[in-house]
Structure formats: structure tokens, C-alpha cells
């Protein structure tokens, strides 16, 4: 079983309440969003992986926001391209 001390993670994020929010958000991304962990898995659960990523400075709230915005922009661009292709096919 992995042992994680959250003190380092709290120091990276600022307070324990924000840490819970960021770690939960990242763990959810790994569980349901198909995102790969940025640290070796070592048979850990996603919550432990999220805390380890935060401790190592690989993830914080700003990083998650930027990544989500980029993914949303990529998805919107792909959708626009698909709609354009459909519209051009009807001409």
C-alpha cells in the first residue's frame, strides 16, 4: 500500500481544502477521462497518484485549467472541421 504524506502537497497547493479539490479533479480525470498518470503507477489508486503528482509539482489548479482549455479548443476545432466538411459535401 502506498503511503502518502500530504504535507508536501498542501505546501504546493496552499491549503488542504484546495488540495482536496485539485486532487479529486485530477483523480477523476484519470478514472473517467482516460488521462494517463504523470508518475509511475506502482499499483496505486488514482487518488494516491493525484497526490503524488501534486507533491512533485506536476499538477496544480492552473495546470489543470490550461489543459482543459486546450482540450476544449481542440475538440471545438475538430467539430468545426467536421461541420465544414459536411457543409462542403452538400454543395
Curated annotation (Swiss-Prot):
EC assignment: 2.7.7.6
Primary enzyme class: transferase
Keywords for this protein: DNA-directed RNA polymerase, Nucleotidyltransferase, Transcription, Transferase
Molecular function GO labels: DNA binding; DNA-directed RNA polymerase activity
BP GO terms, sorted: DNA-templated transcription
Cellular component aspect of the GO annotation: DNA-directed RNA polymerase complex
Catalyzed chemical reaction(s): RNA(n) + a ribonucleoside 5'-triphosphate = RNA(n+1) + diphosphate
InterPro entries per UniProt: DNA-dir_RNA_pol_omega, Pol_omega/Rpo6/RPB6, RPB6/omega-like_sf
Described purpose of this protein according to its UniProt entry: Promotes RNA polymerase assembly. Latches the N- and C-terminal regions of the beta' subunit thereby facilitating its interaction with the beta and alpha subunits.
Subunit relationships: The RNAP catalytic core consists of 2 alpha, 1 beta, 1 beta' and 1 omega subunit. When a sigma factor is associated with the core the holoenzyme is formed, which can initiate transcription.
Stated family: Belongs to the RNA polymerase subunit omega family.
HAMAP family on file: RNApol_bact_RpoZ
NCBIfam families on file: rpoZ (TIGR00690)
Protein name: DNA-directed RNA polymerase subunit omega
Organism for this UniProt entry: Edwardsiella ictaluri (strain 93-146)
Primary gene name: rpoZ
Amino acid at each position: 500500500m502506498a503511503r502518502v504524506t500530504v504535507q508536501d502537497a498542501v505546501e504546493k497547493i496552499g491549503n488542504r481544502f484546495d488540495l482536496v479539490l485539485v486532487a479529486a479533479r485530477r483523480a477523476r480525470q484519470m478514472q473517467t477521462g482516460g488521462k494517463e498518470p504523470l508518475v509511475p503507477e506502482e499499483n496505486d489508486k488514482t487518488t494516491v497518484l493525484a497526490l503524488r503528482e501534486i507533491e512533485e509539482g506536476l499538477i496544480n489548479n492552473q495546470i489543470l485549467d490550461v489543459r482543459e482549455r486546450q482540450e476544449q479548443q481542440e475538440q471545438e476545432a475538430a467539430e468545426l472541421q467536421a461541420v465544414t466538411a459536411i457543409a462542403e459535401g452538400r454543395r
